[in-house]
């Protein structure tokens, strides 16, 4: 694949969720979620359908016209997740998706990611330092200083890995 083909493949197959929501403050939730679709050949009506569906999937259909400043941190992260899934990617990569949230909101986000995996058959790769996340995943792969050191079945290991000296 050349660079252009690789970029097109990534755009079609990978959705990204970041620790910091990266929402544009001057855009509504609807407009933030619509952004990736502006690069497609979808009509305005088709984009509207996709955005409404994505916001419904993250339980924010009633917040479409809200700006980020009008949302809680957990709601902002759900808008970011809706933006990541609006193109219906095969793989969702979540980089510390709960790192900036309180415990309750973090659990809601982890439950939402689990639901997306089960209901919509999304492969989710999540990077986190939070061992509490393990109970929400199928497999945990552990790295220490960038080196793979093993894997376990999710939910099985409640003890955080001790970093090497």
Place the predicted regions along the sequence by residue.
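Long, low-complexity, intrinsically disordered segments
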Residues: 162-164
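Conserved switch/coupling elements of ABC/ABC-like ATPase nucleotide-binding domains
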Residues: 145-151, 156
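ABC family nucleotide-binding domain
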Residues: 1-143
